[in-house]
Amino acid sequence: MAGRGCLELGLFCWVLLAVPVGPQPASSVPGAPLTTLTPPPQSEASMLSLNLGLNFKFHLRGPAAVWGSPVTETHPLSPGLGQESEEDLEGDLRTDPLWELLVGSPGNYVPEWGSAEGSFTPWASSLPPESTSPLSGPTKRPTAPSQPRMSTVTWATALTATAPPTSAPRPRQSELELKFDVALRAGAAPTLGHRSLPLLPSLRASLAEIAGRLGPFGFFGTTLSPLRNFSSQSYQGTTAQPSFASEVSDFPGLFGTTGSLPPPLLERKFSSPSPLDSVASPSSASIKTTPVQHDPTVSTSDPDELSPASFGSPSAQPGCEPGSCSEPELSDDSGQPPASPLPLFFLTLEADWAEARARWGLAWEAHVYGAGALFGLVALLALLSLALLPWRCPPGAPCLALLDLLLLSAGTTRAFPLFYDAYGHRDRLPALAWLLLQDLPLPCLAAGLGLACLLLARPRTPRCPIGLAALLLLGLGLAAAAALGSAVHRPLRPLRLASRGLHAFLAAFLSGLLLALSCWGGRRRRAGAPLGGSGFKGATPVPQVRSPFAPRESWRRAARTAPVAGTFGLLSGALQGYEVLHALGYGGQTGLEGPWPWWAFQLGLRLGEVGVALPLALLGLYPALCSPRVPRRCWAKLFRLSPGHAAPLLPGGWVPGIRDKEPLGSAIARGDAELLQLCALAGPGPDLLLQGGSCPGFEGARANTTQSPASSPSSDCTVDFRPPSPINLRRSIEEALCSEALLAPGLFQGPAFGDALSGLGLYRTISLGNKTGAGPSEKSEKVPGSPAPPELPSPGAWPPGSSASSGSLCGLSRDSSSMLLCSSPDRPPRCPLVCVLSPPRPSESSPSLPASGSYQALSPPSRDSPEHASELQAEEALLQEQFLDACRQIDELSMGSDTIDL
């Protein structure tokens, strides 16, 4: 709709500039508001009137002249000429920035803002400080000389002025003067006695109109309290600067100040008028305006303290009565209702404190202190979560940290103005700071909703995707650019309206998505699958990092905050969207005026934002406080180079001693992954997969036992499984053994971390080469707890309730410094013998055990108590037979080494 309107607008601008036109009269009734959409004839200049389907009207006056050249012209206004339309006076004293963008700037001047829709007299402004302000009124009009001005262009509706017939024409202009009026209305024309509301709302919202309603401090802009409209008196003669409007106009503006202002209510002085920009709220009363330049030395004061000389307006009198000033003011005792509704609740908390306490009582304090305390609580929860994240470091910590930062920003930027602005200390901060304080919380909350959707939707580790990151940067950039542009250049203030609309839409959309995710909780997939089943392809297995809400119970608890945040997010987005529509002329309803609707709307906005921020803060705090599994500390991660931190412990020459013989195919390069040995360190030590070497106490065991050269820890590690060719055979066997039969952490009590690292070595599996001919009867004798041969001492029975039967394939060491391969309890192990290093464990029941750590062989029956050992002897023998058969098949299918040599 907006694009089509702009297209039609440009087309008719071209028609106006290309076609010579003639005059077209229009009739009106003197002394009454304008009741037709056709403006009265203003001069002998030519005029073109086009009445289109939706009542577009364009007026072109003046002979052909050079565009953009300044024109000096004076309009002597006498009581006889005082019946001239206010549109011409408005056109003489206003400049429209939109037309300046269309046809070019006629000179170096600062554009001011036009009147609001339906106001009988617009609050006008002109560049020269010595120019005077016209006094509005349909009956009597004093003479006010107009100073030389630039060529002006206006965009206003025909309903903003009265239309008495002129008795004398103005002098012809020597330059072209273009007046461009647009009125888009539907329905019958209003009657003569009063204005009737259109069937369709006005779409005549130019950039100047919108910018005039955009306060510099947000959607609740630096406007006055609605209490000022409910005074018993109405004071005239207030000065309407670009930053302040004393009385009310007739547009249901979102950023409007309120009606007649009694003197005791304006007690705050603003050092600079530039940070303030207010437009009056609708009323039938007129406004007396005085155009001024942006002068930081001029301060807005009370209505009784107006100085006509300071503003160059001899007619702006503080004590002017309605009769003497010729202003048709509708007072309270006039008995005539206002011409349009007064939506006065789109304002900031800028009422006088004593007056607000008298009007609202406890509700005022609840509004200020209650909402401020809730936003402060949000900031404290976010700060606590940020402090706990480095110590707990749950999965998805970067995403949680970003969520906490956004909530901390939103909470502080909302709590600070509520406490700071209520006492009127706004002049202590620059305008840009206040603009950022008002505009940044909305994109932060919208981005927080997006992160909450990401945390609850992804089953794996949440990572900020490119789309969400771009959306976050776009929202923050648009809000910051709108705030900066509004503080620097006034015509850019409509960007803040676009920013508000975008974030209102995003908040509503993401809130609906969050509600959908909370309802979809029963169908949610499991958060990641455990490792296993295919073996490891690297030297050290990397654990799969899961979502901070991976367990179903944790996800259900976290998802309870989603409906609350989604509901309040929809409420906040709807209210913000209604603000944007109201700024464009929609949504004004009778009965919404007054202090209590204003207070209720403000409180609803604050509660909507708190209802979004507080559940999100609890969502970000839950993984840091209520994580079901204590994760590794982030500080430990900082000192580890990579997940494969144990890889440097497995260099290429991992056997420290001299090998008995060189393995076949040694010229083939081997990676570190192939050097992963099939032994684990038992006990609570580091559980690291260490490289070869001697073991403290193992020499004593070697002295008492006779081991084969193959089973020596310093001998060749591959003598038992050396095939005719080394093509993938070593890796195949290691994968087969590592995937099922390694032990879980914490199965035996072992030395401390420092003691274990001193001399522990890495050993290999028990040599099976000398057992190929052994029958099941021979192998069945090796039962835990029974007297064992010296070379294979039994570790004894595992205590009941130990973690031998639990754990996953991949686990953590006891000091959380490494990864350990764990056994799979639900499958029978495929490797019957796994070598471990047990700690010194003196035991009377097993005198064959050495006094220190020994090289032991664990068999599957050792998982159970000795009572069940006899039942598992046959199973152990069968497993060993299957293992040896698999080794023989591998040897048969392997390629000969002589082929490789060729």
From Swiss-Prot:
Major place of residence: membrane
Region of interest: Disordered: 120-149, 262-337, 700-721, 771-811, 836-872
Record has tRNA processing as a keyword: no
Record's bilayer topology term: Multi-pass membrane protein
Gene field: Prrt4
Transmembrane segments: 371-391, 393-413, 431-451, 465-485, 501-521
Secretion signal span: 1-18
Compositionally biased spans, kind Low complexity: 125-139, 799-811, 843-854
Annotated organism of origin: Rattus norvegicus
Example of a GO cellular component annotation carried by this entry: membrane
Protein name: Proline-rich transmembrane protein 4
Chain intervals with Pro residues compositional bias: 786-798
